[in-house]
Amino acid sequence: MKWLQIHITVDQEQVEFTETLLMSLGAVSVTLDDAEDQALLEPLPGETPLWNKVIVTGIYQQDEQDPIDVDTLEAFLKAQLPDVPMRHEELEDQVWERAWMDYYEPIQIGEKFWIVPEWLEPPEADATNIKLDPGLAFGTGNHASTFLCLQWLGKTDVKDKIVIDYGCGSGILGVAALLLGAKKVYATDIDPQAVLATKQNAELNGVLDRLYVGLPEEFDQEFKPQQADVLVANILAGPLMALAPEFAKLLKSDGDFALAGVIEEQVADVSGVYSEFFDILDVEKREENWCRISGKRKTTN
């Protein structure tokens, strides 16, 4: 069986209508992609952020016995969505849901880590190899903020320590800490898909027995009144600033922390909020202005 893809570039406010339209016309899947290489810096908790211009792609089964008339389909779509760019392509029979696997390769991060897609062999068997299913949730090592956090973990003593991974995404940071010898990782995310992905990636790496992961309200019940030795949070500046008092309660005196998901222009504001509770020891910058802020919890009496 072949597949037909229809790509439509629309403004943000047209996305929901376009998705619904494609599904009503029999699309088996609809995906959203950035049309202008625009960074998404500050979504609110629980929101799915969108770019200003979005490529909405509908995928249709193209039955050889009763094929879709592409000209008729496009004419109808153009009548509903006039003056928007639109194109189509046909795909040969394949497992298109996982076709993206061909584009992933192992990534080396610092001196300790390799991020290895689960279907590939590690380039260095003796390295700390993190097996990952990149299709499950955000956090593959490709993004600068994830890279910065992994780099920091590789230099931080986590052996036999309690670690919090706040905003865990794919679970890559928590898994990395466990592979480095952490006693226990407590991970949390507002996205149920991220909770599932973290469990699955921990299982891939044989560390599920030392991991707890849940939504924030579940995490609060499970973790408190403990305190962690290490806390890493790869989210965004707004949520990070709001969570500073909470992180101060979660981390032991003199405990290590790292924050990422912050761009250079936001470093001063985030550091200013955290300086009440934490000593800022280092700010590391990577390409595209993404930064990591790290330091220690101030000693409390």
From Swiss-Prot:
<dbReference type="Pfam" id="PF06325">
    <property type="entry name" value="PrmA"/>
</dbReference>
<protein>
    <recommendedName>
        <fullName>Ribosomal protein L11 methyltransferase</fullName>
        <ecNumber>2.1.1.-</ecNumber>
    </recommendedName>
</protein>
<dbReference type="InterPro" id="IPR004498">
    <property type="entry name" value="Ribosomal_PrmA_MeTrfase"/>
</dbReference>
<dbReference type="GO" id="GO:0032259">
    <property type="term" value="P:methylation"/>
</dbReference>
<feature type="binding site">
    <location>
        <position position="234"/>
    </location>
    <ligand>
        <name>S-adenosyl-L-methionine</name>
    </ligand>
</feature>
<feature type="binding site">
    <location>
        <position position="146"/>
    </location>
    <ligand>
        <name>S-adenosyl-L-methionine</name>
    </ligand>
</feature>
<dbReference type="InterPro" id="IPR029063">
    <property type="entry name" value="SAM-dependent_MTases_sf"/>
</dbReference>
<dbReference type="GO" id="GO:0016279">
    <property type="term" value="F:protein-lysine N-methyltransferase activity"/>
</dbReference>
<comment type="function">
    <text>Methylates ribosomal protein L11.</text>
</comment>
<keyword id="KW-0963">Cytoplasm</keyword>
<feature type="binding site">
    <location>
        <position position="167"/>
    </location>
    <ligand>
        <name>S-adenosyl-L-methionine</name>
    </ligand>
</feature>
<comment type="similarity">
    <text>Belongs to the methyltransferase superfamily. PrmA family.</text>
</comment>
<dbReference type="GO" id="GO:0005829">
    <property type="term" value="C:cytosol"/>
</dbReference>
<dbReference type="InterPro" id="IPR050078">
    <property type="entry name" value="Ribosomal_L11_MeTrfase_PrmA"/>
</dbReference>
<keyword id="KW-0489">Methyltransferase</keyword>
<feature type="binding site">
    <location>
        <position position="189"/>
    </location>
    <ligand>
        <name>S-adenosyl-L-methionine</name>
    </ligand>
</feature>
<keyword id="KW-0808">Transferase</keyword>
<keyword id="KW-0949">S-adenosyl-L-methionine</keyword>
